């Protein structure tokens, strides 16, 4: 469970129907019916990496920090030991709400599509890729994404003349998820091959992923041969709540606080694909002629994960966010 502070502009737009998504204690000025999809699309980006750390202007166009026209000193100068980047998107499919007869109590229903992704990339990874080093020790590479449907019912009401409370209950249907974690990756360039010693794992739910087979009959996954043959339908179910409060200090000054996405999704084992990487591997294709390395690029897609039979599903907490205003 990770707490993330958010400051989207809609939070401070009084009367916005989307505002109540950020704090269930907020009520719009009137009832509403959202236009499907167009009724509300929100995208948030968080982390300690900025766009300017990844993309650089070169000759009138944007290139990544790995481009040869961007020096290593410039590309790596703004990076940290741990570089984190996360994004989440909410697309409102159906939304409507109304005041009760007292015009103080408000209720609403929303059906949203939620997509979340995050990654943790250590400095040593960027250093290895940018400088083309012949060996490296890289720890703690993580990447994840998940998508789910959210059916939410909200209710807000005045507790006193100054305090307004709101709560939202949400039933969640997991569409799919993927997690990759490489805890340790020792890489060394030998005479004509890359040798690695690695410890990592990956999981995927909701999609049927084809595995490869070795001559000895064992099965493995490789991202270069990544083949998702079909979508198997809902892969998990869960529940979450949002809680919010507002306090009118004076007529033109209001304080607010909300905690969103307190909940979980339980992903079943039926559509769970799992791989484990705990041994040394060697990739050929590197040529050394007269002491000079040719075709030295390391291909992360060549990493092999041994297929592991899932014995049980997995329950994961949502990424909790806190909004203050």
Segment roles from a protein language model:
Residues 1-4:
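C-terminal segment of classical bacterial N-terminal signal peptides
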């Amino acid at each position: 469970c990770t707490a993330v502070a958010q400051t989207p502009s809609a939070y401070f737009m009084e009367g916005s129907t989307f505002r109540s998504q950020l704090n269930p204690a907020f009520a719009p000025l009137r009832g509403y019916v959202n236009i499907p999809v167009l009724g509300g699309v929100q995208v948030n980006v968080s982390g300690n990496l900025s766009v300017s750390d990844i993309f650089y202007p070169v000759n009138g166009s944007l290139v990544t920090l790995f481009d040869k026209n961007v020096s290593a000193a410039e590309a790596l100068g703004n990076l940290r030991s741990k570089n984190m980047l996360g994004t989440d998107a909410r697309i409102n499919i159906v939304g409507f709400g109304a005041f009760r007869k007292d015009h103080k109590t408000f209720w609403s229903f929303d059906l949203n599509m939620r997509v979340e992704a995050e990654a943790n990339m250590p400095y040593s990874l960027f250093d290895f890729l940018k400088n083309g080093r012949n060996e490296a020790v890289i720890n703690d590479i993580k990447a994840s994404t998940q998508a789910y449907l959210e059916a939410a019912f909200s209710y807000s009401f005045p507790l006193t003349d100054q305090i307004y409370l709101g709560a939202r209950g949400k039933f969640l249907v997991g569409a799919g998820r993927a997690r990759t974690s490489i805890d340790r990756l020792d890489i060394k360039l030998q005479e004509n091959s890359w040798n690695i010693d690695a410890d990592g794992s990956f999981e995927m739910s909701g999609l049927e992923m084809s595995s490869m087979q070795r001559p000895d009959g064992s099965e493995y996954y490789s991202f270069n041969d990544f083949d998702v043959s079909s979508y198997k339908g809902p892969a998990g179910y869960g529940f979450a709540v949002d809680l919010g409060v507002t306090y009118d200090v004076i007529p033109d000054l209001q304080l607010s606080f909300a905690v969103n996405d307190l909940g979980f999704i339980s992903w079943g084992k039926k559509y769970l694909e799992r791989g484990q990487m705990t041994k040394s591997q060697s990739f050929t294709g590197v040529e050394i002629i007269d002491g000079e390395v040719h075709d030295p690029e390391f291909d992360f897609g060549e990493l092999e994960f041994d297929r592991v039979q899932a014995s049980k599903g997995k329950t994961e907490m949502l990424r909790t966010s806190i909004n203050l205003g």
